[in-house]
Design a protein with these regions (language model features):
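Active-site acidic Asp-centered loop
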Residues: 60-62
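Conserved core of the sugar-phosphate nucleotidyltransferase
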Residues: 38, 43-44, 64-155
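Short beta-strand scaffold positions
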Residues: 8-9, 129, 159
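Hydrophobic helical membrane-anchoring modules
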Residues: 149-150, 155-177
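Short phosphate-binding loop-to-helix
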Residues: 11-58, 67-74
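Residues in the short beta-alpha loop(s) of Rossmann-like NAD(P)-binding domains
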Residues: 9-12, 92
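Short, small-residue-biased leader/transition segments that mark boundaries at the very start
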Residues: 1-2
Length: 177
């Protein structure tokens, strides 16, 4: 059985949850101190794991509004199967990357086609799925045997700034066509 809970300190979102209560969605109030800018994500997860008893946790971020439920369901199946201890969403980056003023993933004297570069996966905040023991034993949301679920650039849109919001509106308009 799944528990579907929105873990939030702001009770003004409750009216948005009411239409889904008949499908098992519940509001779970979290302490407002967890809203602070100095609070790290792992602190929020630690409190959530203490507040909600479950075998497997699925965390999503509202700042990634284009995440498909099918992506979450497919990644969850990998963890439920026992083949993986966790799963997370990622986009594949296969381009010329730099770090600390130097090429990171290619040799400037032997430039290969981008499609021949080794793919690099970038975590997104679309979702993290993990077994309780992963967090209890390792203190992290990704275990030692994670499944990397590749999402597309639309699902990967993350809204952190006003500019991101404007971009997301353009994506929403495009996807609505």
């Amino acid at each position: 059985m799944y528990k579907r809970q929105v873990y939030c300190s702001d009770e003004t979102i409750k009216p948005y949850i009411v239409p889904y209560e008949n499908k098992g969605l519940q509001f779970l109030k979290r302490d407002s101190y967890l809203d602070g800018f100095q609070v790290k994500g792992l602190e929020i997860i630690e409190r959530f794991v203490k507040d909600v008893d479950a075998d497997i946790y699925v965390l999503t971020h509202v700042t990634q509004p284009f995440t498909k439920s099918s992506s979450i369901e497919n990644a969850l199946k990998k963890v439920v199967s026992g083949e993986y201890d966790s799963a997370f969403s990622a986009v594949v980056l296969q381009d010329y990357m730099w770090m600390n003023g130097k090429p990171f993933n290619y040799d400037m004297k032997n430039i290969v086609r981008t499609q021949d570069l080794t793919p690099i996966y970038m975590e997104t905040g679309a979702f993290f799925i993990f077994r309780k023991e992963v967090f209890i034993e390792l203190g992290q949301r990704i275990g030692n045997k994670p499944y990397i679920y590749e999402i597309d650039q639309f699902e990967a849109v993350d809204i952190d700034t006003a500019e991101d919001f404007e971009f997301a509106k353009a994506v929403a308009t495009y996807l609505a066509k």
